[in-house]
Swiss-Prot record:
UniProt KW Signal keyword: no
Gene: ND3
UniProt KW Protein transport keyword: no
Entries under InterPro entries matching the protein: NAD(P)H_OxRDtase_bac/plastid, NADH_UbQ/plastoQ_OxRdtase_su3, NDAH_ubi_oxred_su3_sf
Gene Ontology CC, one term: mitochondrial membrane
UniProt xrefs under Gene3D superfamilies: NADH:ubiquinone/plastoquinone oxidoreductase, chain 3 (1.20.58.1610)
Keywords recorded for this protein, A-Z: Electron transport, Membrane, Mitochondrion, NAD, Respiratory chain, Translocase, Transmembrane, Transmembrane helix, Transport, Ubiquinone
TM annotation in the entry: 7-27, 62-82, 87-107
Protein name: NADH-ubiquinone oxidoreductase chain 3
GO molecular function: NADH dehydrogenase (ubiquinone) activity
Catalyzed reaction equations: a ubiquinone + NADH + 5 H(+)(in) = a ubiquinol + NAD(+) + 4 H(+)(out)
Membrane topology annotation: Multi-pass membrane protein
Function: Core subunit of the mitochondrial membrane respiratory chain NADH dehydrogenase (Complex I) that is believed to belong to the minimal assembly required for catalysis. Complex I functions in the transfer of electrons from NADH to the respiratory chain. The immediate electron acceptor for the enzyme is believed to be ubiquinone.
């Protein structure tokens, strides 16, 4: 149990620090009345043209998910490319299988029209 003491101490310190950082702003804040102008969106000194929490097109969400997936692909390819001279054929073909699966997924999304902005 003694080998877990540093982990427990750091966990307790981080929890205490988090609680302190959550409580201190409430202690030092002033309880002034809030005006509707302070709660509205600020648009460079002009009156707001619309609601700040407006809906956005679902295609933006889809493109962001696709970006994250293919960005993670690059993070997997970088260590593979750095150690390319040291890996054997199994490492090469496993990465080619990974690339094939991602390419099939990309072609599927392209075929379904996920990347079209009509």
């Amino acid at each position: 149990m003694l080998e877990f003491a540093p982990i427990c101490i750091s966990l307790v310190i981080s929890l205490l620090l988090s609680l302190i950082l959550l409580v201190v702003p409430f202690l030092f804040s002033s309880n002034s009345s809030t005006y509707p102008e302070k709660l509205s969106a600020y648009e460079c000194g002009f009156d707001p043209f619309g609601d700040a929490r407006s809906r956005f097109d679902i295609r933006f969400y889809l493109v962001s998910i696709l970006f994250i997936i293919f960005d993670l692909e690059v993070t997997f390819f970088f260590p593979w490319a750095v150690s390319f001279n040291k890996i054997d054929l199994f490492g090469f073909w496993s990465m080619m299988a990974f690339l094939l699966i991602l390419t099939i997924g990309f072609l599927y999304e392209w075929k379904r029209g996920a990347l079209d902005w009509e």
